[in-house]
């Protein structure tokens, strides 16, 4: 059965991409709109005609409210984009590899469902933001095209190897286009897997898809490319520093977290200050002087990783059954998001003792995110320490999860696991708690 919008388009000879003038009846008023006809969403009821206005936004007009429609220009077939093996290069510019993994920075609207889907190749992304060619000679490479919720540890390994390959072949830096939802996990993973890092590795994404007027994709990519040729030889996340298009912040890969579902400045450095502010015009203001500096030497990949690691959140009413299930299923490590300073219910402690006795590494973080785990303050914490829990200082739960998987990839000796978890490898542990970083 045809929907109303399908019949309307057929009756008036409308095609997707046609430029039309629509007269809409609204009470006694008549309102005129001009725009491009968009494909009807497959899953919509089909009661509206969708057109894209010249400001880039889409509007839906009820079919029953349309008093007249005129085709101003029929859609023209879009020219096919030509792809070349070698993109234009300029003498004297540094070289940057862009690794494409998907995500919103490389996405378009799927008009069949109305959802956002990964779409651009790395080359399309580079061509969509020509400003980056004035910053560096760009070598794009598409590794995979997924949304970040589909990211897996095996993909982290591939990204790490491709990044190291580029850096060891005389590239000046690497930019990784990545979805924002799990970008913090990937940034942490690369921070541990890329050893002896001598050049910048920058993860970048966007909160608004590339075809939206409010997209932050272009500015984020420009700023990310600026940081990729900078002096900071760190794994960084570069995203908007505030909601307007002024500057981006470069966050250390082990201390950064997505803190808002939709704001463009969603990423925050937690328990730490960002490495730098970076403006699209190339200005960089370093906010700290202890960042790793660009240097010489070959980047090494240490991608050993134990995937049987889980995060367990503590909440009122939680029982030890969840923890026991993980132990019985052969998990090698458990990161607990404890309450406050790092606590669990007292009746869960026997299950934790059993887990440790069975060789399972149990680590404690705080679901507060800000602040530091301290198991020496209250009796519950002291019991957890006695049970063998490893307090993870001020590490983010996500970072602790990634680090524990990486550590267990190297050893299953719990004494060595404790030593490695409490060793600061990539800035994941700050030496003291800074009070000026709370909710900044």
Swiss-Prot record:
Transmembrane segments: none
GO molecular function, a single term: asparaginase activity
EC number(s) given by UniProt: 6.3.5.-
SUPFAM superfamilies: GatD N-terminal domain-like, Glutaminase/Asparaginase
Binding partners and assembly: Heterodimer of GatD and GatE.
Keywords: ATP-binding, Ligase, Nucleotide-binding, Protein biosynthesis
Gene3D superfamilies hit by this protein: 2.30.30.520, 3.40.50.40, L-asparaginase, N-terminal domain
Pfam family membership, one: Asparaginase_C
GO annotation terms (biological process): amino acid metabolic process; regulation of translational fidelity; translation
Known role: Allows the formation of correctly charged Gln-tRNA(Gln) through the transamidation of misacylated Glu-tRNA(Gln) in organisms which lack glutaminyl-tRNA synthetase. The reaction takes place in the presence of glutamine and ATP through an activated gamma-phospho-Glu-tRNA(Gln). The GatDE system is specific for glutamate and does not act on aspartate.
Start and end residues of each Asparaginase/glutaminase domain: 94-424
Name of the encoding gene: gatD
Family: Belongs to the asparaginase 1 family. GatD subfamily.
Active-site residues, as the UniProt record annotates them: 104, 180, 181, 258
Reaction catalysis annotation: L-glutamyl-tRNA(Gln) + L-glutamine + ATP + H2O = L-glutaminyl-tRNA(Gln) + L-glutamate + ADP + phosphate + H(+)
Name of this protein: Glutamyl-tRNA(Gln) amidotransferase subunit D
């Amino acid at each position: 059965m045809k929907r109303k919008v399908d019949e309307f388009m057929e009756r008036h000879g409308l095609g997707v991409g046609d430029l039309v003038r629509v007269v809409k009846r609204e009470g006694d008023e008549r309102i005129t709109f001009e725009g491009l006809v968009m494909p009807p969403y497959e899953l919509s009821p089909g009661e509206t005609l969708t057109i894209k206005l010249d400001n880039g936004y889409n509007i839906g007009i009820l079919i029953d409210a349309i008093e007249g429609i005129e085709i101003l220009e029929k859609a023209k077939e879009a020219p096919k984009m030509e792809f070349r093996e070698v993109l234009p290069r300029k003498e004297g510019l540094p070289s940057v590899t862009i690794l494409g993994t998907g995500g919103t920075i490389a996405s378009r609207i799927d008009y069949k469902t109305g959802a956002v889907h990964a779409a651009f190749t790395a080359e399309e992304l580079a061509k969509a933001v020509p400003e980056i060619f004035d910053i560096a000679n760009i070598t794009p490479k598409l590794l995979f095209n997924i949304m970040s919720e589909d990211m897996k540890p095996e993909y982290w390994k591939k990204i790490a190897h491709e990044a190291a390959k580029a850096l060891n072949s005389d590239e000046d830096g690497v930019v990784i286009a990545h979805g924002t939802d799990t970008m913090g996990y990937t940034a942490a993973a690369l921070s541990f897997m890329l050893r002896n890092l001598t050049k910048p590795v920058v993860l970048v994404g966007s909160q608004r898809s590339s075809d939206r007027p409010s997209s932050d994709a272009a500015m984020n990519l420009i700023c990310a490319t600026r940081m990729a040729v900078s002096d900071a030889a760190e794994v960084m996340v570069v995203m908007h520093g505030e909601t307007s298009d002024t500057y981006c912040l470069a966050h250390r890969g082990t201390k950064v977290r997505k803190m808002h579902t939709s704001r463009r400045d969603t990423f925050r450095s937690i328990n730490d200050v960002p490495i730098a502010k970076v403006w699209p015009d190339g200005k960089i203001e370093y906010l700290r002087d202890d960042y790793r500096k660009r240097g010489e030497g070959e980047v090494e990949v240490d991608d050993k990783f134990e995937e049987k690691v889980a995060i367990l959140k503590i909440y009122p009413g939680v029982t030890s059954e969840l923890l026991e299930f993980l132990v019985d299923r052969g998990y090698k490590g458990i990161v607990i998001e404890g309450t406050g300073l790092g606590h669990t219910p007292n009746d869960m402690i026997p299950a934790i003792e059993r887990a440790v006795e069975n060789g399972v590494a149990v680590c404690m973080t705080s679901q507060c995110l800000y602040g530091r785990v301290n198991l020496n303050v209250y009796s519950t914490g002291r019991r957890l320490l006695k049970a063998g829990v490893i307090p993870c200082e001020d590490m983010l739960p996500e970072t602790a999860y990634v680090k524990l998987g990486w550590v267990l990839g190297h050893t299953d000796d719990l004494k060595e696991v404790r030593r490695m978890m409490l060793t600061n490898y990539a800035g994941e542990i700050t030496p003291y708690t800074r009070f000026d970083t709370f909710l900044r």
